Swiss-Prot record:
GO terms for biological process: ubiquinone biosynthetic process. The gene is ubiD. Belongs to the UbiD family. InterPro entries: UbiD (IPR002830), UbiD-like_C (IPR049381), UbiD-like_N (IPR049383), UbiD_bacteria (IPR023677), UbiD_Rift_dom (IPR048304). Prenylated FMN binds at residues 180-182, 194-196, 199-200. This is 3-octaprenyl-4-hydroxybenzoate carboxy-lyase. It comes from Burkholderia mallei (strain ATCC 23344). Keywords: Cell membrane, Decarboxylase, Flavoprotein, FMN, Lyase, Manganese, Membrane, Metal-binding, Ubiquinone biosynthesis. Catalyzes the decarboxylation of 3-octaprenyl-4-hydroxy benzoate to 2-octaprenylphenol, an intermediate step in ubiquinone biosynthesis. Homohexamer.
Length: 519
């Protein structure tokens, strides 16, 4: 089943019993978080709050709260286990797009041409009179407080926009970038754009500030896009392919786009059937900035981007299960808000796993496996345990071929995808260890690891800014554990031989099992 827009997806989920409408008044301040958190932990449905307290816009929460709903959003209709297997097919598609195999036969060349044609055919198309612009707020009508923006946790600094797809373009790029960055509400038309330095939006902004210093930087934020576009924004799409094209491949139909209506932002294109779109700019700082609060970190001082309006963001509860520190980020000033009639506001929360990002991580884990295997054929499985805050720990299963092989794989994973830049811990195991079973992983660590020989420590590496355990914000260490069987050259001792029951005895006990009445 392919979904043209969010409403189509909501209808499909409701038909499958995967969405529940909440008609009772529920407050966006804390109550929605608590309700969504309980439902997600129970493996329950997406929630559509028809009557959010104090607001007229319905709120959609817990949309991707199970792997099955993630797969449904990518066009795969199956239960959780089958859905995860199907997501590997999407990973194989991405792998082929990222690095196509040279054709060995005429048949292979035909497949490669078919794939290239499919990508070409799924280029987005621009439409006129798009649904996302049925209603336009401008001037004094622009008031973000009218939207039911959630305050997720008691210690949060204020309401937080969480599921916005931020659309940017760098001055030297033809393709647009889609990224999901949380945004703190600080005024009727102002949000703090929390994009980390390595993310696409931040890179586009810095390049623009260098090339056009003192000029406003155009930005659009999309709320309530179709599921394929939302998931395309969190998938490791090759740089040669736009997220809109990839969404078209998932959907089986070209992504319909609309030009933004605000002068200066109209070079950006947004999904034509999105629920709500915020259009505006990051403006240069006018005059001297207000003094920083006592004890606050210093304002950005280096680089062209430092000359733009910034504000102190946070603290907010995050996917680590803790409140993060305050930091300075650019201020996004909203000039216009466009929307569909009867628009739906899409939201989420982040907290100690499991949360929605953790579920997305479980699903995207299956997409990562073929990508890794394309680069490292020795990798036989890969797992990002959700308890590891989506990406901070990885368990790698491999077919080991020589001494030192596991360490090569560690460094390969750390450097392969941007998503693994912040992975703090990597454990490498042999093929006989199930990476999804902590009991087996712990057994491998405790029986196959010598702490001095098999631990790799790397200092002064990029680390998530939210990781307060690192000694310096954004810079910390990484640790790899080689929990594989050791080869000659790695040990001078005779390696242990695993205990295994005689096959004939196992077969006899299989026959006795039913006779004894144990089945």
């Amino acid at each position: 089943m392919k979904y043209r827009d969010l409403r189509d997806f909501i209808h499909g989920l409701e038909q499958r019993g995967e969405l529940r409408r909440v008609t009772q008044p529920v407050s966006p301040v804390l109550e929605m978080t608590e309700l969504c958190d309980r439902v997600l932990r129970a493996g329950g449905p997406a929630l559509l709050f028809d009557a959010p307290a104090g607001h007229r816009f319905p709120v959609l929460g817990n949309l991707f709260g199970t792997p099955r709903r993630v797969a449904l959003g990518m066009g795969v209709d199956a239960d959780d286990e089958a859905a995860l297997a199907s997501l590997r097919d999407i990973g194989r598609l991405l792998s082929a797009l990222k690095e196509p195999d040279p054709p060995k036969r005429l048949k292979d060349a035909g497949k490669l041409l078919s794939l290239a044609k499919a990508v070409w055919d799924m280029g987005p198309k621009t439409v006129s009179a798009p649904p996302c612009q049925e209603i336009v707020w401008e001037g004094d009508d622009v008031d973000l407080h009218k939207l039911p923006i959630q305050t997720c946790w008691p210690g949060d600094a204020g309401p937080l926009l969480t599921w916005g797809l931020t659309v940017t373009r760098g001055p030297n790029k033809t393709r647009q970038n889609l990224g999901i960055y949380r945004q703190q509400l600080i005024g009727r038309n102002k949000l703090i754009m929390r994009w980390l330095a390595h993310r696409g939006g931040a890179l586009d902004f810095r390049e623009f500030a260098l090339k056009h210093p003192g000029q406003p930087y155009p930005v659009a934020v999309v709320l309530g896009a179709d599921p394929a576009t939302m998931l395309g924004a969190v998938t490791p799409v090759p740089d040669s392919l736009s997220e809109y094209q990839f969404a078209g491949l998932l959907r089986g139909a070209r992504t319909e786009l609309a030009k933004c209506v605000t002068p200066g932002v109209d070079a950006l294109q947004v999904p034509a059937r999105a629920e709500i779109v915020l259009e505006g700019f990051i403006h240069p700082q006018q005059g001297a900035p207000a003094p920083a609060p006592e004890g606050a970190p210093p304002r950005p001082a280096a680089g062209a981007a430092a000359g733009y309006e910034h504000a102190l963001e946070g603290p907010y509860g995050d996917h680590t299960g803790y409140y993060n520190e305050q930091e300075w980020f650019p201020v996004f000033t909203v000039e216009r808000i466009t929307m569909r009639r009867d628009a739906i506001y899409h939201s989420t929360y982040t907290g100690k796993p499991p949360d929605e990002p953790a579920v997305l991580g479980v699903a995207l884990n299956e997409v990562f496996v073929p990508l890794l295997q394309k680069q490292f054929a020795e990798i036989t499985d890969f797992y990002l345990p959700p308890e590891g805050c989506s990406y901070r720990m990885a368990i790698v299963q491999m077919k080991k071929s020589y001494a030192g092989h596991a360490k090569r794989v560690m460094f390969g994973v750390w450097s392969f995808l941007r998503q693994f830049m912040y992975t703090k811990f990597i454990v490498v195991v042999d093929e006989d260890v199930n990476v999804r079973d902590w009991k087996e992983v712990i057994w491998a660590i405790t029986t196959r690891v010598d702490p001095a020989r098999d631990t790799v420590l790397v200092e002064n590496t990029p680390i998530d800014y939210l990781d307060f355990a690192s000694p310096v914000a954004g810079l910390g260490s990484k640790m790899g554990l080689d929990a594989t069987n050791k080869w000659p050259g790695e040990t001078q001792r005779e390696w242990g031989r695993p205990i295994e029951m005689d096959a004939a005895v196992k077969a006899r006990v299989d026959r006795l099992w039913t006779e004894i009445g144990l089945s």
